[in-house]
Amino acid sequence: MFCPHSLSGTKQLPILALSVLLVIVSALPSFAADKIRVAFSAVSPTQGVLWVADVGGLLIKNGISAEIVYTRAAIETLVAGEVDFGQMTGSLMSSARLQGADPVMIAGVQDILEDRLVARPNIKAMEDLRGKRIGVFRFGSASHLRLIYVLPRYGLSNRDVTLLQVGDTPERLIALAGGSIDAALISPPDHLEAQRAGMKILLNLRDLNIAYQGSGLVTTQRVLVRKRDLARRFLKSYVEAIHLVKTNPEISKKAFAKYRQTKDEKRIDDAYQTLRETVKTKPYPSIEGFKTIIEDASERIPAAKTANPKDFIDVSLLEELDKSGFIDALYR
């Protein structure tokens, strides 16, 4: 029997279903990830928290699609606004800030000098470096600034040696082995490779117990103001990555293999253990570490004489995460 009412109801069902679907969809949060670029300045293990955040899927989990790039101009690209975040040393970002730029460190990985001064076998003591060639990453880099900070402790200045821009750690190791340089500052665990090649550890900077802000997560004050939620989510990913470093060797080592471009399990494990032992669960940057950097820079940059170390750090977002109990909850 034909029933007009039934036909009308049937026609209305798809419309009703579509309306309900639209209401549900409109109520769902947007999962479109923020697309950003992030720089890291070296392939040393203390840069690895960023790598673990990527490989561990933590950035995308927090709504961030990041293109992570290795560049020797990490601070320049950050200051220019070409990237939103950078993994770099306190000395690298401090030089830019002292010259009027606005970078700030929002999380710290390393707060003491740990490099080894590695030399060819014929060099037996620090005094033997006089007149010799020492390789650094590039002028103004962490390896350069740390070297000129340490040399005066042993009666040497940068004028007593020839400093050569050689490149990152792999290039410095090759230059050492080939004899084109006589010594170089090498971050652990890569000094072990130098030892295996017959080089001598002339100085372990860790023995000096010098507070010095090494690698950390850096952004700009512009980003903290204009993209604060993005910065909050990025830092959350970073803190979660530290948790993975502490508790998940498998994912962490996968990240090290990818970004250090090696399949050598011994090298991967050495690098991973270095980061695991160095990074703190609550990565507050070191005010004392920045104080050392600024004092050292005062001879080269006039603005350093009146600079306040606290101005180089912004822990407001880290304190939010900490006080909320988020960090402690990761380790329960």
PLM regions: where:
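N-terminal secretory signal peptides that target proteins for export/translocation
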Residues: 1-11
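Bacterial N-terminal signal peptides
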Residues: 14-27
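Short, glycine-/small- and polar/acidic-enriched structural segments
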Residues: 32-178, 182-188, 200-211
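Periplasmic-binding protein-like
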Residues: 40, 109-119, 197-227, 231, ...
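Ligand-binding clefts/hinges and TM-proximal coupling segments of bilobed small-molecule sensing domains
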Residues: 142-157, 161, 237-270, 311-313, ...
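Short helix- or helix-capping micro-motifs
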Residues: 194
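Secondary-structure end/capping motifs
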Residues: 226-305
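Conserved C-terminal helix/tail region of periplasmic/extracytoplasmic solute-binding proteins
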Residues: 295-332
